[in-house]
Amino acid sequence: VSAGTRAFPAGGDVPVVVVGGGQAGLSASYCLAAAGIEHVVLESRSIAWEWKNRRWDSFCLVTPNWQCRLPGYPYRGPDPDGFMVLDEVLGYIEGYVAAIDPPVIEGVEVTALRRGERGGFDLVTTAGAVHAGQVVIASGPYNVPVTPRLAASLPEGIAQVHSGDYRNPEDLPPGAVVVIGTGQSGCQIAEDLHLAGRAVHLATGTAPRVARRYRGKDVVKWLDEMGYYATTVADHPLGEEKRRNVNHYVTGRDGGHDIDLRVFATEGMELYGRLLDVDGTTLRFADDLAANLDGADAVAESIKDTIDGWIDAHGVDAPPEDRRPPV
């Protein structure tokens, strides 16, 4: 992906500098250009580098394709209710770059940002200094890998791989695999390993889950029709706390389906509570597995309750669906 060659404005003034050339930075660039505001986008590596280098082979979107709505470039492919795989996501981003031709300068890392003495902001970069009237930070919340400190206590002979570096089951050494965490990445990687026949031990956390489909529609579609995605942080009951919430686990793999850890357990996956300690090759877990599973199920059921209430309140014609208890 390339937006062409742009010269870095060393020592100069730019009305707006956008930091980060991923989907957020590209979207900001589109909106600034539409408003006629001069700007540059500084990307430390290359456009969509994280997508190209820090996703596993079987990666696919969790939300339906129709929800891909980069400004000025909504998804127009043949499968709006499907879930793009990695190569398709990259193709979508490449198409966006070609369509909007953003003023991205690649290979320039911002190392310091401070308020300027004459107003605005001074940026120090690997290509020199620049002054900006305004700065948009679009570097993303997941670009720095987070590894539990307990990992340092594991023996050197045990291979450790961060989710951003995981590619496929075949790349891992033979033997059982312990997956730490049940956010979206942890659950999807655990499923990837499980489907490949690997022995998987999964340390759970408090991440909630959500059903893939309910009462005739993808749950994401229901939430969109209910106005959930138009709710701002300011209007949300949790306020700023909502920014720190863990995303619900579900998958778009093979057409999309629930991720139910209890079902995985019936198929041989070993589930545990939160990882507490490491003593040599022995791992100690909290006694909170049942609470973690029950909590995830409770959130999934509460979302269904909300959908039921909205259907009833608005007289929507939707097929009934059994609410079966957990496995």
Language-model features: locations:
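Flavin (primarily FAD) cofactor-binding/catalytic cores of flavoenzymes
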Residues: 2-21, 27-50, 84-327
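N-terminal glycine-rich dinucleotide-binding loop that anchors FAD/FMN and/or NAD(P) in oxidoreductases
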Residues: 54-80, 219-236
